[in-house]
């Protein structure tokens, strides 16, 4: 069992686009697309990342707490760890893109809600204006 050194995480040196790509490929399945946690084990196994500091993110990546896999320097370089931390901080600080937030899911869910309400109203109008035979 190899012990990894806690990386020095500097979000200013990280790449936001690389961080997003790494997050989607390695983290989103458990922590959720918005880093809210709860995708696995209701937040007990994969907690929300909203309060994690960049150093805590780097430490978690290297040590793999609980069932989380460890990402050593051969899997993620210091630059990649900083990029991941930058993206996670960006997720937390930039709120809900795409209008009114519905559980931080964004405009796809809003469009779905609009369709459901629109179709419901259309059904009511058809029902009220229709004739009985």
Regions flagged by a language model, labelled:
Residues 20-24, 51, 55, 105-108:
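Sequence context surrounding c-type heme c attachment/ligation sites in exported
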Residues 2-7, 12-15, 20-45, 90-98, ...:
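Periplasmic/extracellular electron-transfer cofactor-ligation site
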Residues 1-5, 73-130:
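C-terminal capping alpha-helices of c-type cytochrome domains
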Residues 1, 34, 40-96:
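Extracytoplasmic electron-transfer domains, predominantly the class I c-type cytochrome c fold
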